[in-house]
């Protein structure tokens, strides 16, 4: 469900460094098509990605192109189209379940969570909720799943439920899910200490997000400032918090940072277009 760009994603056996709702997205930066998306030229980007799909020599390469198309739609805030193409990528991974179950089920969950992330960021909460559940369910189907990875899927889902509740104005439910996520992290600390170290850094994103939608903008800022990932979405949320606090100069500073983000992934898909609109670009 949370950013670091991945290279050769579809060949990796494990991508566990990617956490709640802001995971990296298609391998590398995505080439010329990704640059076109960054410039707001989505139709041209998808034409480039479609050509890559048509010329791809392997099913894995075709799946990569489909995922790039999904992210292209994300840059336009199109939740439904993003989900449609992520579903196509999931279908590819279903064909890999027998050969590489330790990766295939994980990637199925990743793709569903990626669609969910785009949907929640752009306000389609019902679709986001459905895809977050789908992501948890798909990922947890992994045969002989390790305890730490099982914790990971629970943590991601609780993280998502807290954010969804916060967006819907249900402060009590949001806080309940934050505490559930904390408890799962504590369990992960024992089950898989290395995975715990990867995931604990994403907690300020959650607490800051919940604080922001509860109207506590100072706490939101303080929490976001604890996030050391240089995440484009967090940068955009800091700009939003400064706006709410009436500090337009700081808001502009952070919108400019968000507009300059690089990445072909859900955080950038929200941050870059939103920042450019705010700045009148």
Locations of regions flagged by a protein language model:
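Boundary/linker segments of alpha-helical solenoid repeat arrays
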Residues: 59-62, 93-104, 139-150, 185-196, ...
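"A position-specific structural signal for the A-helix of alpha-solenoid helical repeats
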Residues: 31, 68, 107-110, 114, ...
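TPR/TPR-like (Sel1-like) alpha-helical repeat modules
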Residues: 87-91, 136, 179-183, 248-266
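Disordered, low-complexity segments in secreted/periplasmic proteins that are enriched in proline
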Residues: 18-32
